[in-house]
């Protein structure tokens, strides 16, 4: 399980480092797949950034604030050096805090913020006794925090378009 968490953290760190502005407008809905997922566990998904545009082939994503309770957390993350906001209002991930440990810490802080501020999850998914994965679809495109009822999972991911493989 620790190896999977490390690999996931490295993957998310890579996505965060290459995230930057591009000129394709994000349209449609997306999905997040949690694999492996623990049986009989509730996963809460929180949208923390809007996805304005993306280029799937280059793995480039342009994010903006959501205009809700997450904006204060995003401002705090900018102050702490995890994120940057450029002059056009696009949120990018800092290259100075892009290590797997930094990504995990950012995710932990985001989940603590959601709990402390009683933020309602954008979506929830409960796995069955025999489920080893969970897919949450129909999500607005954006950057999401995923937390579990057991605290076993704490990660960040982009809701990819439904056609994304």
Residue ranges and their predicted role:
Residues 1-165:
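Solvent-exposed loop/turn and edge beta-strand elements of beta-rich ligand-binding domains
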């Amino acid at each position: 399980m620790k190896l999977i968490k490390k690999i996931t953290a490295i993957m998310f760190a890579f996505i965060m480092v290459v995230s930057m502005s591009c000129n394709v407008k994000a349209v449609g809905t997306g999905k997040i797949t949690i694999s492996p997922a623990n049986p009989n566990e509730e996963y809460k998904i929180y949208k923390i950034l809007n996805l304005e545009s993306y280029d799937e082939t280059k793995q480039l994503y342009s994010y903006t604030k959501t205009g809700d309770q997450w904006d204060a957390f995003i401002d705090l993350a900018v102050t702490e050096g995890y994120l940057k906001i450029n002059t056009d209002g696009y949120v990018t991930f800092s290259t100075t805090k892009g290590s797997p440990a930094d990504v995990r810490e950012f995710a932990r802080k985001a989940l603590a913020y959601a709990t402390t501020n009683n933020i309602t999850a954008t979506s929830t998914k409960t796995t069955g006794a025999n489920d080893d994965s969970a897919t949450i679809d129909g999500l607005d495109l954006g950057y999401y925090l995923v937390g579990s009822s057991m605290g076993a999972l704490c990660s960040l991911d982009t809701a990819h378009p439904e056609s994304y493989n």
